[in-house]
């Protein structure tokens, strides 16, 4: 397993450390597992070669990775993640499956690998990218002609319930700005065609405190780069406002599924 140290001085590096510390990620990340299952189901009918070359960005502990290796057992897989501890767990969780695989610590927003690949795929990682259009451009350049870039990321309606609480108390939302369907549709690189599908996943918590605790348990609590923490007193009032409901505090994950096919090779000839 290749373990270069990349991106530790920036926000992506802090995100990687958060996920690396999330010891219970594989057991607690139920939404991430559900989204990986859904993305894998959407890939079933995609016509890949019998022995495809596949790159996964942000493999985590291997939710999607297992689907990929089962779907294309003759493939060659490169599994990457910004967190070395996550990669170690992914390697362990795939140990019972036959097939060719490599593991590499890498910031998926700034790929340090060479293509071409038949499939570049990512589930619930791209929401951490600072420049999503630029990342899509870079990842699409790794595709073979007729290769696919497929991913699941978060959309603009994610945690809209918590956003409402923040607005009610004059507190900044503190989460990155996620794209809506139309905005993501405008990000597709030239040289191919893409489509976007969406889903809304409600997740019930006992309270706002339970919601924030769940984010910490899976390492997904890193705020946006410009966020300033609110006072403890204000946070207590905000959390109190989420208590007392008959069904606790439900938040929505707005998931965008993107599928881009490279229709021709516009890379320069060397």
From Swiss-Prot:
Pathway: Cofactor biosynthesis; biotin biosynthesis
Keyword Phosphoprotein carried by entry: no
Key words of the record: Biotin biosynthesis, Methyltransferase, S-adenosyl-L-methionine, Transferase
GO biological process, one term: biotin biosynthetic process
Organism: Magnetococcus marinus (strain ATCC BAA-1437 / JCM 17883 / MC-1)
Keyword DNA repair: no
Catalytic activity, EC: 2.1.1.197
Biological role: Converts the free carboxyl group of a malonyl-thioester to its methyl ester by transfer of a methyl group from S-adenosyl-L-methionine (SAM). It allows to synthesize pimeloyl-ACP via the fatty acid synthetic pathway.
Disulfide topology: none
GO molecular function: carboxyl-O-methyltransferase activity; malonyl-CoA methyltransferase activity
InterPro entries assigned: BioC (IPR011814), Malonyl-ACP_OMT (IPR050602), Methyltransf_12 (IPR013217), SAM-dependent_MTases_sf (IPR029063)
Family: Belongs to the methyltransferase superfamily.
Pfam families: Methyltransf_12
Protein name, per record: Malonyl-[acyl-carrier protein] O-methyltransferase
Catalytic activity: malonyl-[ACP] + S-adenosyl-L-methionine = malonyl-[ACP] methyl ester + S-adenosyl-L-homocysteine
